[in-house]
């Protein structure tokens, strides 16, 4: 059986990247929440 996680850098960046997060209000909320929490990595 094939596993569900088949890593791809392109897909990873396109769906969870910083620029994608900044496009929507919800995404910006995520970034701000991670900033407030003090996360080292805000987005992938």
From Swiss-Prot:
Keyword Ribosomal protein tagged: yes
Cystines in this chain: none
Cellular component terms per the entry's GO annotation: ribonucleoprotein complex; ribosome
Record-linked InterPro entries: Ribosomal_bL34, Ribosomal_bL34_CS
Highest taxon, organism lineage: Bacteria
Keywords from the named record: Ribonucleoprotein, Ribosomal protein
GO biological process, any: translation
GO molecular function: structural constituent of ribosome
Family: Belongs to the bacterial ribosomal protein bL34 family.
Protein name, UniProt field: Large ribosomal subunit protein bL34
Organism name: Burkholderia multivorans (strain ATCC 17616 / 249)
